[in-house]
């Protein structure tokens, strides 16, 4: 059995499920999953768990993400991104400066509440929102709280001849954040219709785009029996606090016993040497093995 983490660079035009399906065929391994869905049009880091590493998926999914994208001010779309139909157009504000944009972006830092876009996979009454949208039906959408730790402009404002304004941005956010909704809400705060015109995920669960492999690159390596794209299982807990345990504590964990450890973190990745051996969960004043990996 193959075990490990793959830092996959998902390309545009495929779903996250498509990527997993292709890897199952390529590696001839059924036990494969991904750690955080990417929309079909979005490129970037898609953490993949193989074999025993699939037990780490929930922690990879919960980890923070970093995205780089582009906002277009001047019109909104049905999907809140460039793939949708134009809903409304508006003139740019009389005063639109980089200082104003930067100042407005800072108002989104910290915990904010979002309304998921209609074209999303969020379920309401057992149906996905995009199913309602395609049927022309409206439904009340559940609001959700997310955390934005970074939201900054990364390019000058680019004013076009047809009355639009575009600029690039970078955002670091919690699980469940809709970046296209963030782009729309930013436009609303600036008093103008807007949408997200480009997006890529540049980091997720400690994995970065610079070291990611495309499916084509992985296929080429597999054909040469080269497996260096497969990372150790430890990469699956990169975002969890780390606790190194001794031999006695290792024995206690192997029997499922609780430990008293100097930490207040709700979850710990327990390491013995360089190997992760368990995920520990705080219960009262002790840590109980939640997942034992030895």
Curated annotation (Swiss-Prot):
Q: In the record, which residues are listed under signal peptide?
A: none
Task: Fetch the Pfam families from UniProt.
Answer: TruB_C_2 (PF16198), TruB_N (PF01509)
Enzyme class at the top of the EC tree:
isomerase
Q: Give this protein's Gene Ontology molecular function annotations.
A: RNA binding; tRNA pseudouridine(55) synthase activity
Q: Where is the active site?
A: 39 (nucleophile)
Reactions catalysed, semicolon-separated, are: uridine(55) in tRNA = pseudouridine(55) in tRNA
GO biological process terms held by the UniProt record: mRNA pseudouridine synthesis; tRNA pseudouridine synthesis
SUPFAM superfamilies for this protein = Pseudouridine synthase
The answer on whether this UniProt entry bears the keyword Iron reads no
Family statement drawn from the similarity comment of this UniProt entry: Belongs to the pseudouridine synthase TruB family. Type 1 subfamily.
Q: What is this protein called?
A: tRNA pseudouridine synthase B
Q: What is the lineage of its organism?
A: Bacteria, Bacillati, Bacillota, Bacilli, Lactobacillales
């Amino acid at each position: 059995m193959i075990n490990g983490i793959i830092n996959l660079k998902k390309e545009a035009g495929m779903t996250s499920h498509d990527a997993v399906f292709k890897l199952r065929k390529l590696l001839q391994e059924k036990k494969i999953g991904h750690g955080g869905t990417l929309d079909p049009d979005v490129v970037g880091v898609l953490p993949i768990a193989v074999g025993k590493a699939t037990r780490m998926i929930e922690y990879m999914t919960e980890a923070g993400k970093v995205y780089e994208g582009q906002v277009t001010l001047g019109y909104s779309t049905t999907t809140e991104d460039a793939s949708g139909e134009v809903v409304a157009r508006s003139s740019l504000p009389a005063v639109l400066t980089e200082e104003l944009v930067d100042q407005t972006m800072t108002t989104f830092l910290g915990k904010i509440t979002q309304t998921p876009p209609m074209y999303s996979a969020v379920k309401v009454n057992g149906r996905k929102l995009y199913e309602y949208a395609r049927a022309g039906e409206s439904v009340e959408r559940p609001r959700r709280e997310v955390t934005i730790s970074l939201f900054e402009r990364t390019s000058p404002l680019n004013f076009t001849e047809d009355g639009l304004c575009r600029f690039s941005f970078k955002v670091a956010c919690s699980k469940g954040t809709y970046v296209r909704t963030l782009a729309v809400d930013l436009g609303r705060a600036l008093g103008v219709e807007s949408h997200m015109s480009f997006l890529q995920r540049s980091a997720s669960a400690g994995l970065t785009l610079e070291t990611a492999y495309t499916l084509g690159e992985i296929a080429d390596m597999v054909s040469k029996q080269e497996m260096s794209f497969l990372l150790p299982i430890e990469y699956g807990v990169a975002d969890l606090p780390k606790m190194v345990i001794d031999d006695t504590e290792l024995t206690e964990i192997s029997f499922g016993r609780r430990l008293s450890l100097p930490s207040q973190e709700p979850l710990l990745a327990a390491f013995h040497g360089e190997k992760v051996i368990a995920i520990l969960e705080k219960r009262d004043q002790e840590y109980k093995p939640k997942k034992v990996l030895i």
